[in-house]
């Protein structure tokens, strides 16, 4: 299917991109510019204004670009020997990159200068428009390999259903997709003592690196997963649990009812996810791959 990419599952990250455009001009034209004799006025100010406007209007010009909240646009114009260089930097905190905004700004700024100088320079040309660099997005947080990470999945449910099976399968597929070794997958009753026993077995006996539970995080009479998890945790990771709920709350008002907790027992990361398929999908999109950086921290490495 063609058209816009669906970025609704992505999280907001800091994005930046820099684009460069170069116009080739004659030495005579440079003389006119230096003496303020450009027939249509100040080319530098016009390029800065048009480039800034173009960055903010990219989605109107390029049909499949997303409307992006632009936080910063900077257009620099420098005149050298027989050339004019335009350098554009764009910044945003959003789900998708700002490369097209930077390139569009550089393009329109160069076309503006072309329009203003063409009456006096028959050999004027736009030599190049290129993306110089870009940064941002979830890929910046991916590590080279997670093949040594051992994982376990625990489904807490009084009555095993297709939904629980599907939620567990989704978690397994996600973990396998990032190279984790699935040590065990269990479905157990939503019973506090049983959950505690299994979590201890995973962390203390099997020494798995990450345990993801699904189910039992609500406010029902048989929802005990958070209580069981808290009882055996040595350190809570409040920020992760808050991030999961905040991500979900932007998609459904029911996310605030989840009581899932996240934390460490020894070097084992334990993550409570809700039981519904949609909640599991949204939560996994939210925390991976960023959560995996914790294993470097546990080894004594600093943040990037």
Regions found by a protein language model. Name each.
Residues 165-167, 223-227, 284-285:
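Short amphipathic alpha-helical segments
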Residues 230-256, 294-301:
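Short, acidic/small-residue loops that bind anionic groups at enzyme active sites
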Residues 173, 177, 246, 289:
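Short, well-ordered alpha-helices that flank and scaffold nucleotide-derived cofactor binding pockets
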Residues 60-66, 249:
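Active-site phosphate-binding and catalytic loops of NTP-dependent enzymes
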Residues 115-122, 139-190, 194-196:
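Glycine-rich phosphate/diphosphate-binding loop of Rossmann-like nucleotide-binding domains
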Residues 172-236:
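N-terminal small/polar loop signature for handling phosphorylated ligands or for N-terminal nucleophile
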Residues 1-44, 49-60, 71-72, 76-150, ...:
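C-terminal binding/interaction regions
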């Amino acid at each position: 299917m063609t058209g816009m990419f669906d970025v609704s599952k992505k999280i907001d990250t800091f994005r930046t991109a820099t684009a460069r455009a170069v116009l080739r001009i004659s030495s005579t034209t440079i003389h006119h510019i230096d003496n303020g004799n450009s027939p249509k006025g100040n080319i530098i100010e016009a390029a800065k204004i048009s480039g800034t406007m173009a960055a903010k209007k990219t989605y109107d010009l390029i049909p499949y670009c997303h409307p992006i909240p632009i936080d910063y646009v900077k257009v620099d114009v420098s005149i050298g020997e027989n050339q004019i260089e335009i350098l554009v930097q764009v910044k945003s905190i959003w789900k998708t990159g700002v490369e097209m905004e930077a390139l569009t700004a550089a393009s329109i700024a160069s076309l503006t200068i072309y329009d203003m100088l063409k009456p006096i320079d028959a050999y004027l040309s736009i030599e190049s428009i290129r993306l110089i660099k870009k940064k941002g997005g979830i890929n910046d947080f991916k590590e080279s390999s997670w093949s040594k990470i051992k994982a376990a999945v625990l489904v807490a449910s009084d009555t095993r259903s297709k939904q629980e099976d599907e939620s567990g399968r989704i978690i397994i597929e996600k973990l396998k997709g990032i190279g984790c070794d699935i040590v065990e997958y269990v479905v157990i009753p939503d019973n506090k003592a049983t959950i505690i026993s299994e979590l201890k077995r995973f962390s203390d006996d099997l020494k798995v690196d990450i345990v993801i539970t699904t189910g039992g995080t609500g406010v029902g009479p048989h929802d005990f997963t958070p209580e069981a998890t808290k009882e055996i945790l040595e350190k809570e990771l409040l920020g992760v649990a808050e991030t999961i709920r905040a991500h979900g709350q932007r998609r459904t008002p029911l996310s605030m009812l989840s009581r899932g907790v996240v934390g460490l027992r020894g070097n084992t990361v334990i993550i409570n996810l809700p039981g519904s398929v949609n909640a599991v999908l949204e939560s996994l999109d939210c925390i991976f791959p960023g959560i995996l950086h914790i294993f470097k921290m546990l080894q004594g490495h600093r943040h990037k």
